[in-house]
């Protein structure tokens, strides 16, 4: 099936199964809404085994992100935590380029092979691939979310920048001067780890940051959208409708069909 995402009816559209006539310059809003739907329905409401296993092994989503506390008690998403941040891994070769994961079920800090630092080791060990193993060759299950399956977790408020209203998308009315990004406070599940300096640090995973940034509702506190029809928060189908002119039901349909095909064919959906 071919879906043509374009403002104008063209020769490509004639041969497509579906035409999505977005306003010029708003395709990002449409696609971000698709991602919102896919995360909500294939990762949260129902955990797709194929997607779950794939993102844990082949993406940066299970890697640990440090949260930086602000003066008002809220937090900002910081950098990825590295081997240099932990005493047990600080002497690793290229330690600044080796990233950290947490082990599911134990919360233990683990150093997986396969990140950039392993590619450039002096001794060519061939440990270049993410295989779910640590530096000792032991297999472990990386934690994808700090929320956990048992429903027990700690939550803090994290500041996210909403850039969706920095420019007006109405044609011919943008003056070239952007608005300031809005500050959005959202709850994020966290874990506590002790770094090489003996300091306790709040961390989360890139997956948890992504879900919060895109407003995927998991029952956490803060400015999350209530449902797909909530146009007050960015990335929902209703929000993209007012930006792109595409009906909210259509964006939901496209997202579901794209992800459903990817799940059933193990990755044979392409944009």
Give the location of each predicted region.
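Long, well-ordered, tryptophan-enriched scaffold segments
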Residues: 10-14, 18-264
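Short, acidic/small-residue loops that bind anionic groups at enzyme active sites
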Residues: 1-8
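Short, intrinsically disordered, charge-balanced linker/junction segments flanking boundaries
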Residues: 1, 263-271
């Amino acid at each position: 099936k071919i879906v043509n995402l374009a403002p104008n009816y063209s020769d490509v559209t004639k041969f497509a199964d579906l035409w999505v006539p977005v306003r010029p310059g708003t395709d990002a809003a449409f696609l971000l809404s698709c991602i919102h739907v896919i995360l909500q329905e294939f990762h949260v409401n129902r955990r797709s085994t194929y997607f779950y296993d794939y993102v844990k092994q082949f993406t940066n989503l299970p890697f640990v992100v440090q949260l930086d506390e602000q003066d008002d008690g809220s937090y900002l998403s910081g950098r990825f935590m590295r081997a240099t941040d932990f005493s047990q891994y600080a002497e690793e070769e290229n330690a600044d380029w080796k990233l950290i994961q947490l082990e599911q079920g134990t919360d233990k800090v683990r150093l997986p092979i396969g990140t950039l630092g392993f590619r450039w080791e002096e001794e060519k060990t061939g440990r270049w691939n993410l295989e779910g193993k640590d530096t000792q060759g032991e297999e472990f299950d990386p934690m994808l979310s700090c929320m956990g399956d048992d429903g027990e977790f700690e939550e803090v408020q994290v500041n996210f920048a909403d850039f969706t209203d920095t420019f007006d998308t109405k044609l011919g009315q943008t003056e070239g001067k952007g608005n300031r990004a809005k500050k959005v406070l959202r709850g994020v599940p966290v874990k506590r780890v002790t770094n090489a300096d003996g300091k306790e640090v709040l961390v989360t995973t890139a997956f948890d940051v992504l879900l919060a940034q895109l407003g995927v509702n998991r029952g956490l506190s803060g400015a999350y959208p209530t449902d797909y029809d909530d146009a007050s928060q960015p990335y929902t189908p209703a929000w993209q409708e007012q930006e792109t002119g595409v009906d909210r039901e259509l964006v939901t349909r496209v997202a579901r069909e794209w992800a459903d095909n990817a799940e059933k064919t193990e990755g044979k959906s392409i944009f």
